[in-house]
Structures are given as structure tokens and as C-alpha cells.
Curated annotation (Swiss-Prot):
The gene is TPS28. The lineage of its organism: Eukaryota, Viridiplantae, Streptophyta, Embryophyta, Tracheophyta. Keywords: Chloroplast, Isomerase, Magnesium, Metal-binding, Plastid, Transit peptide. Mg(2+) binds at D379, D381. Pfam families: Terpene_synth (PF01397), Terpene_synth_C (PF03936). Inhibited by high concentrations of magnesium. Disulfide bonds: none annotated. It comes from Tripterygium wilfordii (Thunder God vine). This is (-)-kolavenyl diphosphate synthase TPS28, chloroplastic. The Asp-Xaa-Asp-Asp (DXDD) motif is important for the catalytic activity through binding to Mg(2+). It catalyses: (2E,6E,10E)-geranylgeranyl diphosphate = (-)-kolavenyl diphosphate.
Amino acid sequence: MFMSSSSSSHARRPQLSSFSYLHPPLPFPGLSFFNTRDKRVNFDSTRIICIAKSKPARTTPEYSDVLQTGLPLIVEDDIQEQEEPLEVSLENQIRQGVDIVKSMLGSMEDGETSISAYDTAWVALVENIHHPGSPQFPSSLQWIANNQLPDGSWGDPDVFLAHDRLINTLACVIALKKWNIHPHKCKRGLSFVKENISKLEKENEEHMLIGFEIAFPSLLEMAKKLGIEIPDDSPALQDIYTKRDLKLTRIPKDIMHNVPTTLLYSLEGLPSLDWEKLVKLQCTDGSFLFSPSSTAFALMHTKDGNCFSYINNLVHKFNGGVPTVYPVDLFEHIWCVDRLQRLGISRFFHPEIKECLGYVHRYWTKDGICWARNSRVQDIDDTAMGFRLLRLHGYEVSPDVFKQFRKGDEFVCFMGQSNQAITGIYNLYRASQMMFPEETILEEAKKFSVNFLREKRAASELLDKWIITKDLPGEVGFALDVPWYACLPRVETRLYIEQYGGQDDVWIGKTLYRMPYVNNNVYLELAKLDYNNCQSLHRIEWDNIQKWYEGYNLGGFGVNKRSLLRTYFLATSNIFEPERSVERLTWAKTVILVQAIASYFENSREERIEFANEFQKFLNTRGYINGRRLDVKQATKGLIEMVFATLNQFSLDALVVHGEDITHHLYQSWEKWVLTWQEGGDRREGEAELLVQTINLMAGHTHSQEEELYERLFKLTNTVCHQLGHYHHLNKDKQPQQVEDNGGYNNSNPESISKLQIESDMRELVQLVLNSSDGMDSNIKQTFLTVTKSFYYTAFTHPGTVNYHIAKVLFERVV
């Protein structure tokens, strides 16, 4: 359960609780809010107790390790020996975790972020406008004095990055020296700089801070003027000076003084600036591209009132310290939604997510967005993530926002960037998969991003310049290997829970910084708890569906347990929510019944026709003519009675849940499939339509099938799934075709031509499903896409990968 501890009287913002398991004990430290003053969320440390049955818990590596010809060994005894499901519901624990996250999402304003010692030092350097010789913001100096680390440095206390510690520490030493205070702290800080400056040589270049090659030499020059002696013969420093000189020669001074660019973010390191021109490029909040240090530098030179207001507001808001960038409202709103979705817990927060995306859409522009609202500079990372989420949620957004980022055959994050960001191109790739027909710019974006990411993966160069995260190679690898058309929600969640670093993930700006509403252990532990809770139910269902399988002797009709497991896995990976159990089981049983009928009669057209005729007779008479049972072959009779018994159970389940009798609709749907199948013996013809119709009926969704849009959705879904089914059948014994390195397919191969048609139809289907202006219930439309993606997954996912996903999703608990 969640248990509140006594409130802290500490002046800093209260910690937001994280979760911890007591069996076994794993400490999860609380989530700190880094000295912010306005306190909207007040939750103390909490923990969760998971109570399991007395039987010792076991993990289930055998499902991923014990393979026979690429398939898991399915043995009844193995299944029964697995860890038993939880004895008690964790509903209350989950509810309390959800309440915490709801409070977080409901308190969003300009973004929660950590304090930057470097930026705070620049603010502390500002001289009082009315009292020369004294600091304008003494509370910033006090923050510096209060936050020196035990080793004498300033910076992120939990991650040692030499670039971060050195630039933070040198800036703070300069600020203290400037005002001749705390000489002991200055001495300790200077000793740290001298002892650690050589470590710059050993760090990954990808993790060099933004603008470090400009800002750090500038600080060294300031230190020298203040009489602070720092050895400048280090090879690392010489390399930094070389990079600075090269970058300064590339800066288009005429452009930067007349057009907003990312250079506004790092003015404090640039010489010979024309402030009369630059002040015209201020953001509406008075900042220079939302950078406190850049704005403080401008304030020193201009005494501009808008600059002063921006800095003054931050100093008061954060109790003397300031972040490295602020606001970060769009960044926070977008990335929170992405994390919640990938962690599989977004269903708890529909109103909050709607509000988040509505906020983002209000500040969306024809050129995209950046991390903060009302910016005249945009970046591809925030634009791509925003585009993807807005389109997924039915907003009309044009892909033309990406045109400004296209430079020749490449796409860049910013104008004038020196190197690409892995995550920026990764998010561009994710956005490009939301493609509608005729969106050429997204085709080009997908082609470029696929090539770029594959090259980086092949070279083991998946380090990013914007974030240090737990498993970026895993995230990128999954996205490349399992494209969005084949991405099943529960598979993505199961893997992302392991990839998400929680509060250990740290972002790279001018300094390292934290985004506690984006990266925290609260989301992570709630996701783990919810996943295991759902999985426990799925394991119970798996046991029950095996009993249903055995009870009807479906093995005798050509359906083996491997097929049963895969079918249930597909249903569960798409419809995983506990409250949607009837839809999930209906999906699995419908597919198994279709397979049994098609498998048993696949070699005889006459028997198919006989089955179809008897099926219709049974349908019309409910099994009786003049009070006597139909006289048919035992197998046909058994299958027909099996189908109708199962359909009647479906109807009863729907009646109990939704209070609506769907028997007639179910019978009609099955009759349509049977008649279609008996003509050519192809079970795939119309199977998707049967599945979509059945799932929607079980979900309580009814809609007129006469409408043109409904008919178009069925036609597209049937066409694509039929092609995918055949593709899978033809290629099930060989490696599925992979996307070529150029993001397309080899058109000389007949199978590739069919694949291109599938891709074209998928784009149209995605457009129909995501279009919110047609008036159709989005839940109804989503079923069409969900079913189609399951067919896509089956067709293009290697059997070994499927086995791995089955083991992870159904049988391996999250720890």
C-alpha cells in the first residue's frame, strides 16, 4: 500500500513519492524538485507492498531459452509451475499511484526542471543597476554558496561528467571571486578545476555540453582577468580552443544579428556583438531564446528592462538559483505524454493527456515548435514528437513543418548545427511513420532517418548529445526492427519499462539538467506495478483458454498449442487492459475457431460447402428441424455446435457488460465469413472483418455498416490483412523481408511490389482512422488499425523474435 511519512519542514520543494517493493526490498529514492518555490504537489515517500501467494516466486526463462525449431516448448506442467498470480488485487495501490501522477500532470505550468550552477553564476555576476559595486541578485550568490558539493565542485551531484562539473565550477568560482566572498569555497573549487581538467580528454564528444567550446574558453579569459590562474597547456584545452576558433569562423554575424537563430542561446561566449540589433530578437518573455545565462549576459551590456524582468522572475521563482533553460513547457507536456504512453499507463490519464496535447496544439505553428511556447526558433526534435502525438490523437497537423529542416538529402535539427542528435533523428523517424498518402516530405524523412539510425547502430555510435539515458540503443533498435505498423502496445511497453531510466536519465544542455515530470521513478514503478498486475490476469486467462481448447478438443481439428499461445499473445499484446477481458478472449477464441474450421476442411471443397450449408441451417433453426437434430457428420456437427456455443457465450458476456443483445450481429458476421470462406477455402478472406466486427460488438460499439466510411474501412482492412496473411503463409519458413537500407523495398521482387501496395493501403487506413473530423467514434476506427497491425506483426516479424516477445510479455514478470 501507499503509506505517508511525516512531512518535511525543509525549505526546498517537497519530494514526490516513488515506489518500492518490499519483496524483495529495493530502495527507490524520492523525486526531488530542485529548489523550486511554488509547491503544487506534496507527496512524501511512499512504498508498495506486493502480496503474493506462499508458493516461491519463479521467473520463467524457459519460455525464451527452451526452443524447438524456433518455437517455445509448450508443456502444460511447465505453465502450472510458473509463479502464481497475485492473491489480492492491487487496485488500491495502483489508484494511489495514479492519483500522484494526476497531481503532477494537473500542476504543469512552465516546466519543472533543475537548477544550473553555471547559469546561476552568470546571474550572480550582474552588477546592481542602482548600486554599482554590488550584485543585483545576492540570492543567486547565496545559492552558489549553499550548493557546493563535497569535492569542491558544482554540478549534478549524481552524475559525474567532466564537462558539466568543470564549467559549473569555474563559473561559480568566478562569481564568488568577482564579489570577493567565500574565499575558502573559491579555493576548493579552483583546486577541483585544476585536478580534473585533464579528464576532458577522456569523455565522449557526443556528451560535450551545448556550446561548451564557446562558453568554457570565455570563462577562462574571465578568470584570467580576475587573477585566477588555470593551466592552459592541457591538450584537451588546446582542442577546445581549436573548436572554438573553427566555430567562430562559421558564425554568420550578419544573419545572427537580424534573424532569430540558436546562437541567441549562447551569447555569453560570443565576442563583438551588436546589442542594438540583438535586443530586437528577444523572446516575448524578455529572454534570449529562454537562456538565463545568455539573458544575464545581455542584461550586463544593455541594462534592458525586459531582460531584467525575465531574470528577476526566475530568481524569485527558484529561490536564487536559475535553470539552464526556461520555460520548458512544450518539452515537458510532449515528453510526459510520450513516456506515459510507452510505459503503458496512459489509459489512466485520458483527461490530463487531452489537456496536455490541447496545450501543445494551441502553440503549434506552421513551422513547428521548440521546447518553449512563442518561440521564433524551432527544432526538429520537439516538432517531430509534437507532430507524432498530435496526429495520433486526431489533430490536423501538416507535415510541411518538416520542410525547413530539410537540407539537401538530409534533415537537421537546427540551422548551423555541427553534428546530428541521435534522439532528434529517432523522433523524426517515429513521426515519419504517421504518414498519410502523398506526403512526400515524410517519405524523405523516413528514408533519411532509417539510413542514419542504421549506420549509427552498425557503428555502435548510439550516444546522444541531448540526453544520457539508460538504453538508447535498445529504444532505437526496437524502433528499427519493429516498425510502427507492426508495433504491438504490450510488446513496446514490456521492453520500454526496461529501457526507461526513470530519475537516473539526465538531459544535456549548457549543463546537465533534470526534467522530473518526464523522467522519474514514480512513472516507472507505477508502470511495473500495473504491468505485473495485468500479466497476472493474463496468466489466469491463459490457463482458462487452454481448458476451453482442451474441452472442445481443438487439437483434433488441427489447432496446436503453439498456435493457441501465439493467438492469445496477439490478442493480449493489443488489448491488455483488465477491464477489456471479454474483448481479449473473444479475439483469441474467434481466431482459433476460424483456424479450426479452415484447417479441418482445407483439402475438400465439397466438405466446405457441406459445412457452410449446415452452418446456415443451424443458424436459421438453432439446430432443430421438426424437433430433431440435424443429421450431419460428427466433425461438422461438433464444429458447428462449438461455434454457436462460443458465440452464445460471447452474447451473454456482452449482455452482462453492456446490457445489449448482440447475438444477431454475431451470427450475421460469422455467416458472412463462412460463405466467403467456402467459395475459395481461404480463411484470410474476410477474417479481419469478422475479427473487427466481433471485437467492436463485444466492446459495446455499434455503428451503421451502410455508411460509406465504414465500408471503406472494412474494404481496406480486409484487403491489407488478406495480403499480409498470404505473405506470412508464403514466407513463414524463411526470414521475413526487411526494409531496405534506403527505407523502401526492392521493386524487382514481386513480393516487394505486393509489399508496396500494402504500404500504400496502410497509409490510407491510418489516415481514415486518425482523421477526427468524420464524426465516427475513434474507438470503433481504432479497432480496424489494431487488428491490421496484428496481421502486419505476424507477417513481418521473425519467428524467433515472436518467441522472445511471447516470453517477455506473458511469462516474465517485471522486476
